[in-house]
């Protein structure tokens, strides 16, 4: 199974129910479609940057409101497999994505059907898409 490492809080936002983040932004496109495991990276750089933006009032109100269910960010899992999603499309950013508070491209990976593990599993992440040996059984 292919896996993608995503920094927190974005990894948890992708896996959240109800849905928070349906588009993952990447600098590159992929021909892959289908099941994709989501790994939460170990870095807290985005959490720290987001906290600074929140304190400065620089974050978009829609994005902040959407992230509220994930608080507190410091308790989000790091360095773990969170579950699987279905990668249904990969498109360059366009007007189609303007209403999504998190979509900014340059490539928008459209994700559906998040299926979160009951308990996150420690796993070493990598850059890009990578194969994992973890076997995920859908409930």
Predicted regions and their residues:
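Structured alpha/beta reader/binder surfaces that contact nucleic acids or chromatin modification marks
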Residues: 1-139
């Amino acid at each position: 199974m292919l896996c993608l490492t995503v920094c927190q809080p974005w990894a948890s936002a992708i896996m959240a129910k109800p849905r928070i983040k349906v588009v993952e932004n990447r600098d590159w496109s992929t021909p892959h479609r289908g099941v994709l495991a989501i790994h939460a990276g170990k870095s807290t750089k985005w959490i720290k940057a987001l906290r600074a933006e929140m304190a400065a009032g620089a974050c978009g109100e829609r994005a902040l409101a959407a992230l509220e269910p994930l608080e507190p960010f410091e308790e989000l899992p790091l360095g773990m497999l969170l579950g699987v999603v279905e990668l249904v499309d990969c498109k360059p950013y366009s007007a189609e994505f303007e209403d999504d508070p998190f979509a900014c491209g340059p490539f928008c990976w459209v994700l559906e059907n998040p299926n979160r593990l009951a308990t996150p599993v420690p796993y070493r992440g990598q850059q890009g898409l990578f194969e994992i040996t973890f076997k995920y059984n859908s409930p």
